[in-house]
């Protein structure tokens, strides 16, 4: 019986030692800053403005735009793209852009849609395209580049803001 008790105690000590992991950082070891921050759940905003209302799919966004008579702003981006990340940071922190964005149906995509009208000059990121409630892509609202018409950089916030105001002036659908 005594042998059994000693064996059981040794087994419990071994198991508890294995299960208890050292969570402290040893001196000289660097702690990864990504590990110190808790992973936030992914939302539809993907960091472009958590207080804004975002749509989940392109089809839903088109429907909401048409029924609410508000223009649609489609932001194409990639999580791994440094240009997309820089534009996202500026977009999310720019108070006037965030306020104006409330008047749009918003969609941000990390994948391409089957609608080729959203990529008239190629599939690149970041790219922002405006769609009128009449479901017409606003080809007249472009960025500052002639080879990437719908590209914006963090320094283009004034142009983006002006283009958002232009997009709010809806196309006339009268016959």
From Swiss-Prot:
Species in which this protein is naturally found: Mus musculus (Mouse)
Keywords: Disulfide bond, Endoplasmic reticulum, Proto-oncogene, Secreted, Signal
Subunit structure of this chain's protein: Monomer and homodimer. Interacts with LYPD3 and DAG1 (alphaDAG1). Interacts with MUC2; disulfide-linked.
Stretches of the chain forming a coiled coil according to its record: none
Gene3D superfamilies the UniProt entry points to: Glutaredoxin (3.40.30.10)
Tissue specificity annotation: Expressed in lung, skeletal muscle, testis, liver, stomach, colon, small intestine, the goblet cells of the intestine and the mucuous neck cells of the stomach.
Family that this chain belongs to: Belongs to the AGR family.
A GO CC term assigned to this protein in UniProt: endoplasmic reticulum
GO biological process, one term: cell chemotaxis
Compositionally biased tracts (Basic and acidic residues): 29-38
Subcellular location as annotated: Secreted; Endoplasmic reticulum
Matching CDD domains: AGR
Pfam family, one: Thioredoxin_7
Keyword Nucleotide-binding (UniProt): no
Function, as annotated: Required for MUC2 post-transcriptional synthesis and secretion. May play a role in the production of mucus by intestinal cells. Proto-oncogene that may play a role in cell migration, cell differentiation and cell growth. Promotes cell adhesion.
Protein name listed in UniProt: Anterior gradient protein 2 homolog
Signal sequence segment: 1-20
Required to promote cell adhesion, as annotated region: 21-40
Record-linked SUPFAM superfamilies: Thioredoxin-like
Motif (Homodimer stabilization): 45-54, 60-67
Gene name of the encoded protein: Agr2
Region of interest (Disordered), residue spans: 24-44
Knockout mutant characteristics: Mice are viable but display altered production of mucus with loss of production of MUC2 despite expression of its mRNA. They also display an increase in mast cells in the intestine, an increased expression of inflammation-specific genes, and frequent rectal prolapse. This is associated with a higher susceptibility to colitis.
Gene Ontology molecular function terms on file: dystroglycan binding; epidermal growth factor receptor binding; identical protein binding; protein homodimerization activity
Family annotation (InterPro entries): AGR/TXD, Thioredoxin-like_sf
Predominant place of localization: secreted
